């Protein structure tokens, strides 16, 4: 899973693409409505004008997608560390985490030393056991 900043960048890229798609759709499929009653309705024989119901339905879908993406972006922004946290609090948290990391690293080193000690003890026991078996076989042969 990607980090939150990468997710945020991807969402921003997606919403920019959605805005562009919406503008392109409106530009290519809108009806030529005059701004006021005094103007004549324009037309373009090469234009592909969508039916009013289809146009409205598609606009609703495009806006819903943009609203959902905006909510996702807001949620990601709110989840970022440091939002509503002062610089001093962030530095204090970093210092606390560094101390905890040093402690955990110390525990890790102790665990590794313990593992090595136990491994050495087991190797010695195995060697003693195999030597004992070898000695008993020699005594039985003699």
From Swiss-Prot:
Pfam families: Med21. One of its GO terms (biological process) is regulation of transcription by RNA polymerase II. Keywords: Activator, Coiled coil, Nucleus, Transcription, Transcription regulation. Residues 87-131 form a coiled coil. It comes from the Eukaryota. One of its GO terms (molecular function) is transcription coregulator activity. Its main location: nucleus. It is found in: Nucleus. InterPro entries: Med7/Med21-like, Mediator_Med21. GO terms for cellular component: mediator complex. Component of the Mediator complex, a coactivator involved in the regulated transcription of nearly all RNA polymerase II-dependent genes. Mediator functions as a bridge to convey information from gene-specific regulatory proteins to the basal RNA polymerase II transcription machinery. Mediator is recruited to promoters by direct interactions with regulatory proteins and serves as a scaffold for the assembly of a functional preinitiation complex with RNA polymerase II and the general transcription factors. Component of the Mediator complex. Belongs to the Mediator complex subunit 21 family. This is Mediator of RNA polymerase II transcription subunit 21. It comes from Eremothecium gossypii (strain ATCC 10895 / CBS 109.51 / FGSC 9923 / NRRL Y-1056).
């Amino acid at each position: 899973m990607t980090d939150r900043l990468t997710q945020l960048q991807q969402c921003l890229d997606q919403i920019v693409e959605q805005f562009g798609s919406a503008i392109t759709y409106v530009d290519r499929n809108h009806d030529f409505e005059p701004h006021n009653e005094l103007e004549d309705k324009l037309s373009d024989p090469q234009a592909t004008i969508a039916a009013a119901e289809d146009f409205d339905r598609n606009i609703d879908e495009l806006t819903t997608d943009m609203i959902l993406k905006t909510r996702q972006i807001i949620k990601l922004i709110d989840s970022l560390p440091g939002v509503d946290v002062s610089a001093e609090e962030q530095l204090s948290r970093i210092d606390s985490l560094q101390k905890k990391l040093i402690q955990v690293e110390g525990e890790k080193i102790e665990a590794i030393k313990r593992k090595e000690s136990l491994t050495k003890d087991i190797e010695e026991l195995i060697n003693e056991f195999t030597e004992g078996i070898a000695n008993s076989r020699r005594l039985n042969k003699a």
